[in-house]
């Protein structure tokens, strides 16, 4: 796999504990004045120096981050095998299988993590210092198998393919900072993390292309190209919607709303206390009508579910216009996401933000460790994703000169 983002190494230097005078000084602080040459009371730079007159952060902020001296850059063992077959009738088949096994993966530990007790479902309660340690894990794997078929039918070129993928990892690692990479990870019990379905895998993907070329205007090629894609949605987790900034475990280093939800067995489940009978009925109706029912009395693993499937159809029309010799203009028209152009309810990507859905609402835990369930939000955090225009139709027109 090779390199990792350098900022992951940089955390140990920028957050080394009391060596740094600067620690997120805020403009509301009446103790710390502006740094030299700073025009505001909340400077966004680091000021280092053992002779500094500025206040060093208190012990509460004295977390320190480090890197395991035996840390190895991520690596995997990779195997693949492929088979190509061309039949007498012109069918071109390809089958390819890939298998990855993690040799050295990335793992974050809080060296100050301490278990303080247990909750009703068996998960621990914790306190943490935020002394994050960059180290390795050998957990994780990925495998994929792809089938491809190609065939020419006169002026028509046809291709279809299918890929099935299964990929597991420990941390999604979507953040540059150790604390957020650690905190924004769905978990059941502290750092007892197993490899789970990756947030980035596409379990099923179908692809089909159709290409038709005909000389409609003189000896100039007119080409129609269709591309159809249908794929499974991203994996996501079902978590508690937690109050405040702490998880139900009591540890602020595990970010709120990222605790995997306990799934009640029914209205009389001894591990939970429902706010009312109406809340109990609503929660259990949701559980019994979804895949959560398979996990009653426990929790659904990280990324156990999938967002809705997505389909897309694109069309490109190109027209050659000969000029002289081998010189020609190529005019093209792209109709992107035709399904959405025809029906604005089609061709839409719906995903759970950060692969997380806070469906079971809790107000806290009881003195005996029961979860205080206050409600249910069946489609929490489900959004239409359109940052790159993937949920909207598009028309592009252009030309190029080829010689």
Describe the predicted segments one by one.
Residues 1, 83, 93-95, 149, ...:
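Membrane-embedded beta-strand positions of outer-membrane beta-barrel proteins
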Residues 223-324, 357-383:
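Extracytoplasmic gating/loop element in the C-terminal half of outer-membrane beta-barrel translocons
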Residues 125, 305, 343-403:
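C-terminal beta-signal and terminal closure region of outer-membrane beta-barrel proteins
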Residues 96-237:
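Gram-negative outer-membrane beta-barrel transporters
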Residues 7, 79, 89-91, 154-156, ...:
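Outer-envelope beta-barrel architecture signal
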Residues 67, 77-81, 143-147, 204-210, ...:
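Hydrophobic, lipid-facing positions within transmembrane beta-strands of outer-membrane proteins
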Residues 5, 85-89, 141, 152-155, ...:
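Outer-membrane beta-barrel strand-turn architecture
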Residues 1-133, 253, 271, 292, ...:
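Solvent-exposed loop/turn elements at secondary-structure boundaries
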